[in-house]
Amino acid sequence: MHLLGPWLLLLVLEYLAFCDSSKWAFEHPETLYAWEGACVWIPCTYRALDGDLESFILFHNPEYNKNTSKFDGTRLYESTKDGKVPSEQKRVQFLGDKKKNCTLSIHPVHVNDSGQLGLRMESKTEKWMERIHLNVSERPFPPHIQLPPEIQESQEVTLTCLLNFSCYGYPIQLQWLLEGVPMRQAAVTSTSLTIKSVFTRSELKFSPQWSHHGKIVTCQLQDADGKFLSNDTVQLNVKHTPKLEIKVTPSDAIVREGDSVTMTCEVSSSNPMYTTVSWLKDGTSLKKQNTLTLNLSEVTKDQSGKYYCQVSNDVGPERSAEVFLQVQYAPEPSTVQILHSPAVEGSEVEFLCMSLANPLPTNYTWYHNGKEMQGRTEEKVHIPKILPWHAGTYSCVAENILGTGQRGPGAELDVQYPPKKVTTVIQNPTPIREGDTVTLSCNYNSSNPSVTRYEWKAHGTWEEPSLGVLKIQNIGWDNTTIACAACNNWCSWASPVALNVQYAPRDVRVRKIKPLSEIHSGNSVSLQCDFSSSHPKEVQFFWEKNGRLLGKESQLNFDSISPEDAGSYSCWVNNSIGQTASKAWTLEVLYAPRRLRVSMSPGDQVMEGKSATLTCESDANPPVSHYTWFDWNNQSLPYHSQKLRLEPVKVQHSGAYWCQGTNSVGKGRSPLSTLNVYYSPETIGRRVAVGLGSCLAILILAICGLKLQRRWKRTQSQQGLQENSSGQSFFVRNKKVRRAPLSEGPHSLGCYNPMMEDGISYTTLRFPETNIPRTGDAETSEMQSPPPDCDDTVTYSVLHKRQMGDYENVIPDFSEDEGIHYSELIQFGVGERPQAQENVDYVILKH
């Protein structure tokens, strides 16, 4: 019982120390590798669930002291709550934190650092010891080369060089070498510093050849300066097919018929070992030849060819290089090959002499139709331009150093050419006229192959009644030449033969020579009778106008063309074959309006109130485009159409009218035409009434005139008395000048009105009665009182004389008329008169 007590206490303490291990979790590499002087990078993570880390101690080979319940060992690193680190711990760095990172770095690392590293972690309530193995060697340890399970030639593989070391403070590099020489291929280097693994790796992609079999591949570890540290080597095991080479006796593989030949197939390399051997000639396997040696005794020319051996292993078969075995012999009977046969005349032809021989023939003899061709000693005969006489049989004989061959049967050369000397022959008697039936034949001299058809170049409609014969019915005038061709594979054309067809003149037409522009009246005009062709060329001309013969010259001339020359012209041209007429050609003469006249409808006598139409008729080319109307005073009327319509017509419209027509050539005017408008019965009645009134007025005036005459005589008898009085009597005749009408103007015409006669105007001046004497009057008693039969008045009269022969609807050129003015002024002697205002009575009588 006493013995169990201490052990039970130890178990309890151990349990208390490790009872909470489930609360700590660590991740890091189990073992780290390094060498003397290098460094160690220890990636590490942890988890403490009860709080942050308060204390961390790195032990070297820690041991638990049961007496003190603590770990003893070399303390490489120790961190306290104040974070201070002793100076002797500078080569060890804690790169972690108080949460989860526990990464460490030891630089430099020494061999005596090998062993266990203990990470003593303490939080507020928990403790933990984590162990990591460290392996430090005296010298750098070598990397390890990893190869694929199998390597075959020409198949790409990846070589891997792995080193279980990596540290940030100590750079290294891995280099690949093949047989001590750096490899040309680029390697890919990668490093890993994770909690899972720490390493440096280099991968090289490589396509090995069979020659790499057994070669040494090295992965060399170097420091940053390229200094060698360590290496690893492997020997390549490259699987490949057998590598072969043929050796021949004799070495040049050239023998004559009957000689012996030995061929040996040497295997220079095979991995794995070869299993089968076979021989082939020109791709065909030789039976019962399964060894590396091939023996051929008494060879023949048929054994000439390409030989090679084929050896197989587990990787596959391999063929050797070919060996060409030449068995020499004299030329065999020759044959001739003709290139491009049958040959076309003018083309090139090449003959080839073919004869089996070894060595090849060095001399040839050629024959044409059994006759030797001088100077032809080559294998080929070339004729650049073949001719018909080259046709025939060609043969040859070949010769080499072993002998002369035999002449073969030869080859036939067929030279083809178009028909020769083709001609076109006219079968008709000459001359040939238009409309005749013509027969022609096509002839030739020779042809190869034979003529199979004919072609013709002819105008119009034709037929070929038999092969090589042409028949043309109703030959045309323009069928000038005809040619034929005889055809086999090609056509040969004969020279065109002229038919010389005679025909009447063609394309007769009238052509205006001058003027080049429009023809105006008075121009000089020339017309030409043209035709395109005539055979025979001797011709005669005839001119016609409206069916009337004019002349027999080729030209028709007009010195001064007139409108009467206009019309339809045609010309005729004839020769000994016939005559041809032109189409009618219209000669158009342009002239100004002429023969103008004014026609009146319904006539030149029209009653007033009716309608009258005046038409301006003319002859013009081109037609009148503009009309102008004038009256008898040459006054332009506002009418510009061909017809002047007066509706209703008035007496004042009576008079002479004329018109003027204008076209693009010029102007023309008509003579005067008079329109007479007479009164209607109603107007005549009114005029008669006015005339009677006028006669009555004249009668009254005559009576008054007699009275005035008597008074005047009385006045003359009392001249003495009048000398003392202030009365005066006088006549004034106002003679107005009338101008004669223009001789070129129209005559004053119209309806005469007899009531339009003389007119008399009267004026009476009356003096008031007075007794007051006037200054300057004679104071004679005789003159104090007027005569009893005298009246103190003044009579003033004007007699207007109408112009005889005038018409009332014709306005005179001048309004002044001839008039006789008569006045009488009488004032009696001084006497008393009653005071009264003087006045004037004025009377005008119009009729």
Swiss-Prot record:
The modification Phosphoserine is found at S725, S726, S729. Residues 1-19 form the signal peptide. GO terms for molecular function: carbohydrate binding; CD4 receptor binding; protein phosphatase binding; sialic acid binding. Its main location: membrane. A motif (ITIM motif 4) lies at residues 840-845. SMART domains: IG (SM00409), IGc2 (SM00408). A motif (ITIM motif 3) lies at residues 820-825. Residues 20-687 are extracellular. It is a single-pass type I membrane protein. The chain crosses the membrane at residues 688-708. It comes from the Eukaryota. One of its GO terms (biological process) is negative regulation of immunoglobulin production. Residues 709-847 are cytoplasmic. Pfam families: C2-set_2, Ig_2, Ig_3, Ig_CD22. Belongs to the immunoglobulin superfamily. SIGLEC (sialic acid binding Ig-like lectin) family. This is B-cell receptor CD22. It comes from Gorilla gorilla gorilla. The gene is CD22.
